[in-house]
Amino acid sequence: KVIDLLASRYDATVRFNGGNNAGHTVKNGDKTLHFSLIPSAALHEQKILISQAVAINPEVLLNEIAMLKKLGVEVDLGIDPRCHVVVPYHQALDGASEASKGKAKTGSLGLGIGFTFEDRTNRAGIRMEDLVQPKVLEEKLRQNWTLKKKRVTEAYGQNFNLVLKDVKIGRAHV
């Protein structure tokens, strides 16, 4: 709320880090919006930027953009191509990890954010720039898929029900 107030004085606002596990509510006049990826100054119709330290779930981002457009807000969004992408296997890992802890659960939301950042740290993640390079994307998915499936089933003892050919990133099938 404070950021939204301050943002009206600047040309751009940046979402610096995190993922869609951290949301914020913006009230501007009669409009109340809930964002988790889009920077809070979006209603000011200024440049909004997402830095490389943000884990992006493309479906969530597309829904937030659609919400703004439905309200007639012009979206001037810049995304660092090095942003890492939340892939369905990150969510599978998150759920399996949480389920394997029994009574010692941490209360994860199951959104896969932590596992996306783990891939970022290990230099194994899929980045936004990979989404426009089909061969690179496919190769990275195949490399990661086997490892993630093995981890879910063997390390966490959970079922891995995802099928690679059925993976959607955003609204596009891979």
Give the ranges of each region predicted by the language model.
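Non-transmembrane, aqueous-exposed alpha-helical and coiled segments at domain scale
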Residues: 1-171
